[in-house]
Amino acid sequence: NTDRPVVNAWRYRNWVFDAMNRDMPFDAMVRHQIAGDQETPEGIVATGYLAIARRFGHDIDKDMYLTYEEMIDNLGKSFLGLTIGCARCHDHKYDPVSAEDYYALYGILASSKYSFPGCEPKGQPKDMVPLLVPSQIETLRKPWQEKADLAKQAKESQQASLGQARKYLSELDPADRVAILQADVPEGAKVPFDSQEASKTIFVRPGEWIQLTVSPKGNHGADSTMVQLVIQAIGSNPNKENPNSDLAANDNTVDKKSVFWSSDALVNDFATTSFQKLGPTNQADLGGQDLVSQDLGGQDLKASWYYAESTKSPELLVELRTSNGGNANIRSWSIGELPSVFANVSDSPANVWTSLAAKSLFMHPGPERPVSLVWVSPIEGQVRVHGFVQDAHPAALDGVSFSVEHWKAPKAGEVFEQMAAILQTPILDPGPAPVIPEAYATVEGTIADARVHLRGDPEKLGEIVPRRWIEILGGDPLKDPKASGRIELADWIAGHPLMARVMVNRVWQWHFGQGLVRTPNDFGSRGDQPSHPELLDQLAAQFVKSGYSIKQLHRWIMNTDAYRRSSSATAEQMLADPENRLLSHYPRRRLTAEEIRDSILACSGNLDRSYGQEHPFPAPATWTFSQHDPFNAVYATNRRSAMMMVQRQRRHPFLALFDGADPNASTPVRQTSSVPTQALYYLNDPFFHEQAAAIAKTLDANEPGPAKVQSMYQQILQRPASDAQAQALLDLVERYEGAPVDAWAAAIRMLMASNEFHFID
C-alpha cells in the first residue's frame, strides 16, 4: 500500500517489446515468462511477468496468498481464457475447475521466490536476480574487492589508533581538569564570561588546552548557539582600546598591541579553501606580534583549534558540509547531523532555520552530545580567557549551558594533533562497487505442496494437494517433484490449444475493437460464444502451424476482406446485423489512450521510439514511503505511452482521462467514455499545446495558406482537406488574435481534437 517503485521493471518491459519486434514465437514467449530462469540466461528477465504481480496489505509477506491468487487468476485469464481464480474458496460454480486444481497450481507458484519490492514495515527492495553467472560476477568484482579490502584494513587501523587516542584522553587525571567557569544561557540571552572577573589565574604550558563546551540543558533538546572565545596573553592596556567589535570597550579590554587568539578569526577559516581540511587550524589574530614575541621569549604563537564532541572519550568533528539549511554561506563540521560547529561566512545575516548573524561562529550540541571548541596553547605563560555565549535561536525554546575548562595535561594537545593527522591520512577509495545487472524476476524457492485454504482462509488449512496440472486439462503430475514445477506449468499452458485460440482472439480484438469472443478473458461457460467459431479455429490452427508468429497473424487479419471494409453500413446490413457481430461493416472504434497520445507525438515529430531504461526514481536508500505518504510521481517523456511509468494506486493522468487500463487488474476490454474533462484537456493542457506548436513551426512560412491547410490535413488526418474544410480552417486562422504561428497552432489543435483524429473508421 506504499506503491513503491520497481526500479528494475524496465528490463521486463523492454524484453516484451524486443520479443515482439523480433517476432519471438508466442509459445516461447509464454514459456519464458513463466519459467525463463530455467531455460536460458536471458529468460530470467522474462519472469518479471510473475514477479511484478500485485502485492497486498501493509506487510506484504503476510498476504502473499493474495499475490499467488493474482498470479493464478492472471495466468488463467491471460493465456487460457479461464477464470481459475474463482476456485480459491470453493470449486468453480460454472466451469470444471476444483479448489484442488487451484491449490495444485498455488503450490507451484508458492515454491518459487520473487523479487521483493519493499514495504513500510520491512524496508527497501531486495532479492533481485543477478543477470551474470557467479564466475562473471567474481571477475567483475575482484579488482574492486581487493581495493575495498585494503580500504577496510586501513579504516580498521585508523579506528584502532583513534581508539587509543580517545582512551588516553578519557583516562586523564581529573585533577588536571580545572573548571574556570560555567553558566546557563537563558532563552534569548547573551552571557559574557571573563576569567579575570572570576578571579581565575590561568597559567598555560605548550600542549595544554582551554575548552569551551556547550551542552544541552536539562530535559531540553539542543539549540543554535553563537560563541566567542578569546585567549589573551596578559599584558598592559593603557589606552582601553577594544580589539573585538563584539565586546564593548571597558576596563577589561586588552591592549591592541598584546597577543590574543580569537575564535572570530576561525570564521575566515571556514570561508577559505583550508576549510576542506580537518584541523588543526592556525588562524589567529596576532596583533603586535614582534613586540609580544620579544616579551614572550620569541615563542611560536601559532595555536591550534579543534572542534570535538565532548563525551568522556572525545571525538573530533569530521563531517564537512559546505552548505546547511540550503545556504552555501553556512558551513560546518559535525558528527552526523549533530553535534556541530558552523559559521556564517557571509557579510550579511543568513535567514535559514533562524537568522544567523554575519561573520559569526556557532555551536550546536546534540540532544545528548555536548560540543566543544578547543584551543591548544602554543606558549608558556599567563592568559586571560573571555568571550560570550548567546542563544542564536530564541524561538526554539531549547536551552543550553556552557563551561570553560583548563586541561593541564601537556601531552593531550599532541593527542588532538595526532587524531587530526590520523583522520587526514588518505585512505584508498575503492569507488562504488561494480554494478551487477539485476532483474526483478523469479527463481526457484522452497519446494512444498500447498494445503487447501478452507473458504479461502489461509488460517484454516485442509488437505495437502500435490502440485499438478488442472484435472480437466489433463491433470498431469510433476516430472520432478524436487523442483517448483514452473517449467511443467509453462509447457502445459504454452502447449494447450486454448492458448492459441485466446491469443488469436486478442489480436483480432486489437484490430476490430472486439474479439470473435467478446469476453477475451473468459472462454468458459459464462463467457460469450464466438461469433465465427470456424474462423477462430482456422486462425488458431494457422497460428500454431506458422510457429506462433504474431507478425504473420497480423498479416492474415489485415488482409481479410472484413478488415478492409468501410465502417459505413447500408440499411439492409443494419437490419440484418444490428450489433455488427457478423462484421457486415468495419466496426468504428476510438483509439486507446496510448494510441491517442502516441499519435499526437508522431504528428508533431517528437515521438521518441527508443525503449529507455529505468525512470528517474529517487534512490532506494532514501525511500520513506508509507501508507499515509505513498510514492507518487509523473515523469514527463516523449517516449511511447507503453514506456511511461505506471503505478498501481494512481494511473497516469492522461491514461486515466482517456480510459486507460486499470493497473490493478487484467483489463480485457477498454471502456470508452466521452466526458467534458477530455475537451478541457485539449483546451488547456501544456503538453498538447506544445505538440501543436511544434507542428505549426514545421509549416513553411512562405507557403500560401491553402497549401498550409493541405499539409496539415495530410500530416494529421492522412487525407486532403475538402474546399469547405480548407476555407473553414483559413477563416479560423484569419480571425485568430495573435501571432500567425499561434493562429496555425490553434488550427492544428482543432484538427487533433476532432473525432476524425480519435476514431478509426
Language-model regions, residue ranges each:
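Primarily short, surface-exposed interaction patches in extracytoplasmic proteins
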Residues: 1-32, 38-40, 95-96, 142-170, ...
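Residues that flank catalytic or metal-binding motifs in active/ligand-binding sites
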Residues: 12, 45-46, 101, 225-227, ...
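Sequence context surrounding c-type heme c attachment/ligation sites in exported
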Residues: 13, 17, 38-145, 403, ...
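Acidic helix/loop microenvironments that form the catalytic cleft of cell-wall polysaccharide enzymes
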Residues: 103-111, 557-565, 750-751
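A structural supersecondary motif
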Residues: 645-648, 656-666
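Globin-like tetrapyrrole-binding proteins
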Residues: 747
